[in-house]
Amino acid sequence: LLADEFCGGFALTPDETAFVRREPLVTLADVTSFCEEVPGARGVNILRRAIRLAADGAASPLEALVRHWLHVPVEHGGYGTGQSAFNVAVDVGEGFGSGMPARRTRVIDICYPRQRCGVECDGLQHESSAQSDDDAHRQTQLSNVGYREERISWKQFSSYQRACEA
């Protein structure tokens, strides 16, 4: 999980109530290169295993958490869904969906391109009615080009996490 966060493009605000976009602290290529430079160093084998589970490009803490939860093998408490990518742009063409303004691309937070499916991680900003309308339109556009998208909100995820800890 830390590798996904270090390789992500976000940082928490000082009061930890929101996040802002920023350049990643490192990339997986940087970490892999480091492991090759110090092959016998303490902890390098653990780091190598961690980066096999990680991906570059998370845009929020929720994306990093959900992708990690989905990707980690079942025997380690995850769902073992296999490799996915963060924030994949999908061409939806023009004019698909309802009469709302068309966007040529939509970005899927956690995407499985070969399976043409993904997960949209809805933070608290997705609670407004305007955002709900855009989310519904987005889902229609993706469906029209053969992508299935599931959604998970921060409230759902934190509730599930609390239930699992009980």
Which residues are covered by each model-predicted region?
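Nuclease-adjacent, charged terminal/linker segments that flank catalytic cores
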Residues: 1-33
